[in-house]
Every structure is written in structure tokens, then in C-alpha cells.
Amino acid sequence: MEVGLNEFLDMKKRYEDFKMKNKREPRYVTTKNGYKVMLPVFKDMLRRYEDFVRINGREPNYISIQPQPNGKIEIKKFRDMLRRYEDFVRINGREPNIIYLEQGKSDHVSLGTFKDMLRRYKDFVRINGREPNYISIQPQPSLKGHWTTKVIEKIGTFHDATSLYERVKKTCKYKYYYNDQVPNHVAVMRMTTSGINCTDACQLFSKVLEEMGYEVKIEHVRVKCNDGKWYGHYLLRVGGFELKDGTIWDYVSATKTGRPLGVPCCTAGFQHLGWGIVGPVYDK
């Protein structure tokens, strides 16, 4: 699959505009037909575009999209990738553009992806004193953020938005009160004891999920429950890594009504009201 030069330049402009506006990189860049090019793949396209211009003194007519494989690599295969990478650098005096997953096979990763795998491999060895059993090809959610660390200390470890939801379901409590009333550091203390409401939960867990690398929005809704009444409610819409864009992540579903990830706390009726919290907001 490939895109023409004009389309690529438009993607590049939108990527740069997003970075300037949001002070971070987007999770993906879309083509004109809606295909999502994930950030590592787009950055590899950008590198190849810049290499072509530098070498040829002109822009290419098109840039190919080379989706990288996903999944996990056993440690034995990763060691072989590392050996081939080091051999290439020693022989050629430079790094390779791509590294094949297995010698003689076509599946490969870009240099940037491989170096991220290598970084995560070294981090694991440093922290655990041993090699991992496997290395994930694509970057995994980060667990190093301030609020992520605080939540892990309180409820135990998790590795993505799905396992976080399950930990919340097992360890946290819901308590009804109006709107947001406590800052995030208090919410962390109360979520496993007296409990917190949907608003304070959204403020806290939106921070956690954003630190992990997900796209997160707080949604203001009305839900109709089994008693036939409508209630104002806040939940999260989350996308990235293992979750499809816009997946419902509802603290009250996890802690009170016991529904699975992706389902709102009440299912008899659902109305979208807006985005963000209406009223005072702590910990902006």
C-alpha cells in the first residue's frame, strides 16, 4: 500500500499541526480514505521520505506504507535480531534501516521500532535482573506516570486499560455524591475505602490512561437504569493499544453494577450530553 506525494505531505502537515497544538505526537495519522497509519509506521514513512530527498535531491512520487507486524518475539529470536543488528553496524559502520524478525523471512521492523524493543529489553533486565521470556514488537502502555504509579501502589499492578478495569472492579468502591468534590490525590486514597463517584473517578483515571498512552475523553451522559429513572453520569471514552477508539471505560460499571468493559453502568437508555466535566474541576 502506498500514498502519493501530495497526500503524504498533507499527512505530514496534519502530524506537525497536531504536535504544535497538543504538545505531543498523535497516536496515528489518517490517509484521505480513512486508513489509520500508526505513529511508528508514519515516522518510518517520514524517515524514508527524508532519506529519499537527501539522497536524490528531490521528493519521491509516492511513499509506501509498510505496516509492521504486531505480537511478541521469543527471547531466542530477539537475541538473534540483536546479533544481526550488531553485525550490520560493525561491518557497515551504520545502523540498518530495517531488521528482519527471522533471517530469510520477509517480516521486519523499522530501526525505530527495533530500538524501542531494545530499550524495553534493557529496562526489563535492569529492573528484574533477568531476561524477559518475550519482547512485544509494538510499544506497550507506559506505567511510569505520576498518577499511574500512585494508583498501582494503591490497587496493585496492571499492564493496560483492560487489566486496570479488572483491578478497579476487584479493589475499588463507588460512592454517590454530587459532581466533583475531591482532588486526585484524595480520590486515590478514598477509591478503595469510602469510595468515589463517577466524576472524581473520571478525573483521576483519565489522567492515568493518558499517562499510559491512550486517547481519552470524558463524556457527559444521561443513563436510564432499571428503576426507570434517568441519571446524569460521567464515563470515559478510551482508544489505543488493545482498545478500539471510543471504547466505554465506566468506573461505575466496574465498581457498582458489575458490567464488563465497554458497557455503561445502566443499559435501559443512553444519551450523550457533551464532552468534559460541567462545573468545578480539580487537578487540571
Curated annotation (Swiss-Prot):
Temperature section of the record: Optimum temperature is 63 degrees Celsius.
Domain notes from UniProt: The N-terminus contains a cell wall binding domain. The endoisopeptidase domain is at the C-terminus.
- The reply to whether Phosphoprotein figures as a keyword in the UniProt entry is no
Q: Which GO terms describe its molecular function?
A: peptidase activity
**What organism does this protein naturally occur in?**
Methanothermobacter phage psiM100
Transmembrane residues, as ranges?
A: none
Q: What is this protein called?
A: Pseudomurein endoisopeptidase PeiW
Question: What ranges does the record give for the region Pseudomurein-binding repeat, renumbered to this chain?
Answer: 4-31, 34-65, 70-100, 106-137
* Cofactor: record remark: Need a divalent cation like Activated by Ca(2+)>Mn(2+)>Mg(2+).
In terms of pH, how does activity behave?
Answer: Optimum pH is 6.4.
UniProt miscellaneous comment: PsiM100 is a defective prophage of methanothermobacter wolfei.
Q: Which EC number applies?
A: 3.4.22.-
Tell me, which GO biological process terms does this entry list? defense response to bacterium; killing of cells of another organism; proteolysis
Q: Which residues form the active site?
A: 198, 233, 250
Free-text function comment from the UniProt entry: Cysteine protease that cleaves the cell wall of its host methanogen under hydrogen limitation of the latter (autolysis). Cleaves the epsilon-Ala-Lys isopeptide bond in the oligopeptides of pseudomurein.
Subunit-level organization: Monomer.
The enzyme class is: hydrolase
Q: Which domain of life is it from?
A: Viruses
